[in-house]
Amino acid sequence: MIKKVKIKKFNGRDFYDMEDYVAVEESYNIFINGEFVKSLSMSPNFLNEFAVGFAISEGFLNKIDKVEVDKNNINIFGEKNDREIKNNKNNKEIKIDIEIIKKIISYEIKAKYWEITGSFHWASMFDLKGNSIIFVEDIGRHNAVDKVIGYAILNNYNLNKLILRYSGRIPSDIVKKAINSGLNIIISKSPPTDKAIELAEENNILLIGFARNGKFNIYTSGRLWEE
């Protein structure tokens, strides 16, 4: 995940030699049912979870049969999807209390690799009672989201009843990942884009941004929000 490198540091007046930690970046070739899809750079952890989360959240597959990781090649086998965004109508039955939102936001995130290098994003999953399920760091925010989605799927969680909290801004492609995987609630310390808000509104996704220091903004609520 990280490694030491030798650097020259300038302190505003002098240079001096020292060692510092940097993030490890690996490039992986992604295949769906043997067909090359794309190459991605990511941290070399939770690769099986990434494979499952990526294939589902990007709409390539709706059922995973097998994942093979061979060095820098990741091959995902399963049933194909038509890649259309699924309308997440079932989320109308999901309610969440403001106290649970407060609990999740107040949960202390220990992003050790980010603290050491400043080079990582993180993503986490919580249940509707505000309990933490999984936490992952990665050099890419989309990768981190895919990894926690994949973890939830592999461990038989119902994603309709999970909450995604992560560190990056919320663009529309993150909302698409939520829709394709069945997530209904996204919380981030950063804001969403206008397209993300529109897409979340259309699909009844509860979108919360600027979740920091006990404060947050609600951008879309739909039928999810319970006063």
UniProtKB/Swiss-Prot annotation:
Main location, first listed in the record: cytoplasm
Cellular component aspect of the GO annotation: cytoplasm
Annotated residues for binding of Mo-bis(molybdopterin guanine dinucleotide): F210, A211, R212, N213, G214, K215
Entry-linked InterPro entries: Cytidine_deaminase-like, FdhD
Pfam families, per the entry: FdhD-NarQ
Cited NCBIfam families: fdhD_narQ
Organism: Methanocaldococcus jannaschii (strain ATCC 43067 / DSM 2661 / JAL-1 / JCM 10045 / NBRC 100440) (Methanococcus jannaschii)
Family, similarity comment: Belongs to the FdhD family.
Localisation per UniProt entry: Cytoplasm
Protein name per the record: Protein FdhD
